[in-house]
Amino acid sequence: MRTHFCGLVDETLIGQTVTLAGWTDVARNLGGVCFIDLRDHEGIVQVTVEPVAGDDASAELFKVAASLGYEDVLQVEGVVRARHAVNDKLRSGKVEVIATRISILNKAAPLPFHAHENPGEETRLKYRYLDLRRPEMQRMQRTRIKLVQALRRHLDARDFQDIETPILTKATPEGARDFLVPARMHPGEFYALPQSPQLFKQILMVAGFDRYYQIARCFRDEALRADRQLEFTQLDMEFAFVRERDVQDFVEDMIRAIFKEVVDVDLAAQFPRMTWAEAMRRYGSDKPDLRIALELVDVAELVKASQFPVFTAAADDADGRVAALLIPGGASLSRKQIDEYAAHAAKYGAKGLAYIKLSETGEVSSPIAKFFSEESFAALLKHVGASNGDIVFFGAGGYTKVSDFMGALRLKAGKDFNLVADGWAPLWVTDFPMFEWDDEAQRYVALHHPFTAPAVDDIADLRANARTAVSRGYDMVLNGNEIGGGSIRIHRPDMQSAVFELLGIGAEEARAKFGFLLDALNYGAPPHGGIAFGIDRIAALMAGTESIRDVIPFPKTTGAQDLMTDAPSPIAADQLAEVHVQVRPKQV
């Protein structure tokens, strides 16, 4: 139906007859001439219709052109000629196509929005097929496509094996809530959709496949936000007979090569490395954005002599923290803006936010100054590096909570004060804690997942020091986004059983949920490790958008709905009966 793509028609085709197909982006009838911007996935070319006096065929052609509306689907035949007025905004802007025939393949109904408009998100998602026609959306989807193609080429060339793993599998606790699928042939029993291929890829290492990858669809029934979806895509990888640096060096080279190929970005020749403890201490985050130069400063020792009980209690607590965040030029914040910072910190667990503001003339404004002697107050300001015109925020309380809300303030201040440097800041975060304590459940939970190997090989040592145990986990961070997470896995069945026990998973429960894994580890499992990269998140970074919904063709809303297909939706009673499911009536 076509000989060329619209966006690729150029000067080399001048004088030639071409057949094009696409959508009417814009149609303009200027009386004596019609101009049609014809669009396909490669871009736009101008089609010109010039009636010839006394020529019935050209008059009919002009009549067809004059009747066109937005998004009508056309086939156009014509001759390429040089344009009198060049349009530098188009690749085809030096030429136009003089139409000799126009066929309307399909008329478009009146549109809810035009391809060059940017309507509200609900409208965009309801008419996603129209939204995806917009040039910006085409660009972002193409970025994602190029990313996946480049990853496949890179791994195929290095002897990785692309192996599929099951979508219908066993429900196993991996942190988030499972999506469950009733098993019609086994009444009362359910499959789960995979949160990741984690256990299957480990078993593939036991099976001797050595190097595995998969562009895997994963499912987690969790709250949605800009960087999370119920279903998402990850590059899943696993290596046999490796240590941490083997995996890290390989995937660092891969990510560097992929960014160069897909978006022509040169990432650092060597990614900096930082332990989890250092990242939390300096930045209040295990995925710090290194483009922001601001750092947290511990001030517990300097506030112990104060008379402020919130500070002294946290400073004297072995699990407490008193941290300061200096914002250069922050004295410009009004009281209302300071209250907004306090409200922002409260979202992350802060019960209050102290501050010291120094005017350009050195005048102090602070609700906590009265609790310090003149000498200790001066020492505090010197320690944090405060100068006239600055503001210092303080957080006090439990170490983790203070780190979280002060880290959130750091990000807010970086954006508010234009302190986010241009460019790309990759980072390895290593040596994560093996466990974290869940106050509600009164037990340890795995910080990564239950299959991450501890840094120690001795089970007695792990049991005796579970609270401070370090794992062999690692994350790759880019511009404050965790784009990849991995670890060396547990390959010994006795160590895996011990970790289950520390997580409150008894032998009977472990056998019921993970018996297949424990059995596999018993039959000669090699040391192995891997990593998984979030395709959606990397594509969003490459495309320059903050929401992964922009790089997913058919995403869900934050309310977990597909507005285009109206999913989820009720199921007929006979279908429910077939899978032995009875739905409780909604509570009014």
From Swiss-Prot:
Spans annotated as Aspartate: 198-201
Residues that bind L-aspartate: 174, 220, 448, 489
Main location: cytoplasm
Chemical reaction(s) catalysed: tRNA(Asp) + L-aspartate + ATP = L-aspartyl-tRNA(Asp) + AMP + diphosphate
Gene Ontology biological process terms from the UniProt entry: aspartyl-tRNA aminoacylation
Gene Ontology, cellular component aspect: cytoplasm
Statement: the UniProt record of this protein carries the keyword Cell division: no
Residues the record lists as binding ATP: 220-222, 229, 482, 534-537
Matches recorded under Gene3D superfamilies: Bira Bifunctional Protein, Domain 2, GAD-like domain, Nucleic acid-binding proteins
Pfam families with a match to the protein in the record: GAD, tRNA-synt_2, tRNA_anti-codon
Presence of the UniProt keyword Hydrolase in the record: no
Subcellular location: Cytoplasm
EC number, UniProt record: 6.1.1.12
Alphabetically ordered keywords of this record: Aminoacyl-tRNA synthetase, ATP-binding, Cytoplasm, Ligase, Nucleotide-binding, Protein biosynthesis
GO molecular function, one term: aspartate-tRNA ligase activity
UniProt family annotation: Belongs to the class-II aminoacyl-tRNA synthetase family. Type 1 subfamily.
Subunit: Homodimer.
Function of the protein: Catalyzes the attachment of L-aspartate to tRNA(Asp) in a two-step reaction: L-aspartate is first activated by ATP to form Asp-AMP and then transferred to the acceptor end of tRNA(Asp).
HAMAP family: Asp_tRNA_synth_type1
Protein's recorded name: Aspartate--tRNA ligase
Organism whose genome encodes this protein: Xanthomonas euvesicatoria pv. vesicatoria (strain 85-10) (Xanthomonas campestris pv. vesicatoria)
